[in-house]
From Swiss-Prot:
UniProtKB keywords: Signal
InterPro entries: HAT_RTT109-like (IPR051236), PLC-like_Pdiesterase_TIM-brl (IPR017946)
Superkingdom of origin: Eukaryota
Protein name: Altered inheritance of mitochondria protein 6
Lineage: Eukaryota, Fungi, Dikarya, Ascomycota, Saccharomycotina
Species this protein is from: Lachancea thermotolerans (strain ATCC 56472 / CBS 6340 / NRRL Y-8284) (Yeast)
Alphabetical GO biological process terms: lipid metabolic process
Amino acid sequence: MKYLSYTITFVKNTHRSCQRINKSASFGMIGSLAIGFVLMIVSFWAGTYVNVRGNPVMLDFSDGASSTRGDSNAHNNLGLTGANLLHFFKNRMSDTKDLTDARGVQVSRFYDEVVRYLTAENAGASTAEGTCFPEGSIVSKLTRNVNVVPKVHSHNDYWRDLPLFEALCHGIPSVEADVWLVDNDTQLAVGHNEAFLDHAHRTLHSLYTGPLLTMLNEVNCNLGDKDHKYGVFYSSPETTLNLYIDFKSPDSTQTYALLMDLYLKPLIDMGYLTYFDMDEEKVVWNPVTVILTGDYPTDPTVLDGQEQKGYYNTTQRFVFLDAPMHKLDEHYSGISVVASASLQQLLGNCKDLSQEADRSLLRQGSLPTESVTCVAKQVQKAQSLGLKTRIWGAPTWPESSKQKLWSQQIFDIGIDFLNTDDLEEVTHL
């Protein structure tokens, strides 16, 4: 701005000089040309600062305090978060003309483009160079101005265009990843079908535990070891994220060992995982809560070691089992924080009501009152043991049936987590 001031002063002085020159008729034309030439140069130069030519505005609006922050805290936040950020990148991808060039694509063009934005080198939140600026973090970019939707689970989250990130953008605090042993049992690949696994780019580390570690490091860089850690939601840092790990491979023992030693250990070392304190017999909540589901091991010596003091012999258990809600007993209250079952499994406990429920689902797209009551009792039993509840496998088509069943699960049955594939739709309920 001082250069603009100097130039304006120069123009005024030039104008006065030219006025004096103009008093002489012989120099009148020269004076006019001089003024015009100077004004043309100033206008062209000033345009680069006031956007006359369409360039970015370069006026300085910073205050004294922020100017001392320095370039170490610069960041590339677009100012769009949540669903708006998703729509921005989807629209940007739709403008792409060349769809044949696959060079450099890893997960997908869409995913890769979003990740490049989230992890840009000038994000300013990395602690690698000693900087600490949570406002420029991935959490800030994804979830600022996003309200947490506490009663929703992102079903088959790994199938989404943006595994993990899409759920966070919608404020969903529960996700899941199906894992398979690959590469001679040295890695866990993520996917629903073993035939379509991508060992290189779709692993538990690349899609989930790696991004989570980065995000949590960025927002906790100002905290001490004993401080309670901030989570992945900007407006609700105390909210834990449920991370379901669905065991798919037959060798559950090896899957568990690899999960603990390779994928969860960095998160544990930083104090980011919820754990069960075996001495105090209580749950200590942290930013991420890992829940084992599917074909997980049930042998206590596998889960907690030979001495039954936790996998790392620290009297802490860093994973919880997804308790079977349809065949629940009290011992799950010490090893679980959630209970799940399919709708059919729960209806199977309703004596002669199962067939009637099936007919009602086909005709009316909803459960009859008797079936709702029966399922609700099983949910209440789990809740009485201190467990959150989730029902999976409910019909999702036609649309009218899905809406009715959502309403019954939330308001009539009292489920804690609604299992859904439609994240954007469910946030508007």
